[in-house]
Amino acid sequence: MQEKIRIKLKAFDHKVLDQSVKQIVDTVKRGGGLVKGPIPLPTRRRVWCVHRSPHKFEQSREHFEMRIHKRLIEIENATPQTIEALMDISLPAGVEVEIKLS
């Protein structure tokens, strides 16, 4: 039975996220694994509306936005050496990694 490894990456900055994805894909390809992806998942966008003044001027508001970018990588035919190489990768700060085996 073949195992699939799904790696889901999340970050606020899409450039840092894409660099991390490229680093993971290169490592897996060097180890001889088969890579599907990176698959861009929907970006989550959160918007907050805040009053500029603490007491009055209801019409004066300011909007703040936060975007969470996501990517999915599927790895098939991963060897133990590939998994060991993935464990040794140091990713930049601000990138959240979620790994699932199926």
From Swiss-Prot:
<comment type="similarity">
    <text>Belongs to the universal ribosomal protein uS10 family.</text>
</comment>
<keyword id="KW-0687">Ribonucleoprotein</keyword>
<dbReference type="GO" id="GO:0000049">
    <property type="term" value="F:tRNA binding"/>
</dbReference>
<dbReference type="Pfam" id="PF00338">
    <property type="entry name" value="Ribosomal_S10"/>
</dbReference>
<dbReference type="InterPro" id="IPR027486">
    <property type="entry name" value="Ribosomal_uS10_dom"/>
</dbReference>
<comment type="subunit">
    <text>Part of the 30S ribosomal subunit.</text>
</comment>
<dbReference type="InterPro" id="IPR018268">
    <property type="entry name" value="Ribosomal_uS10_CS"/>
</dbReference>
<protein>
    <recommendedName>
        <fullName>Small ribosomal subunit protein uS10</fullName>
    </recommendedName>
</protein>
<dbReference type="GO" id="GO:0005840">
    <property type="term" value="C:ribosome"/>
</dbReference>
<dbReference type="GO" id="GO:0003735">
    <property type="term" value="F:structural constituent of ribosome"/>
</dbReference>
<dbReference type="InterPro" id="IPR001848">
    <property type="entry name" value="Ribosomal_uS10"/>
</dbReference>
<dbReference type="GO" id="GO:0006412">
    <property type="term" value="P:translation"/>
</dbReference>
<dbReference type="GO" id="GO:1990904">
    <property type="term" value="C:ribonucleoprotein complex"/>
</dbReference>
<dbReference type="InterPro" id="IPR036838">
    <property type="entry name" value="Ribosomal_uS10_dom_sf"/>
</dbReference>
<keyword id="KW-0689">Ribosomal protein</keyword>
<comment type="function">
    <text>Involved in the binding of tRNA to the ribosomes.</text>
</comment>
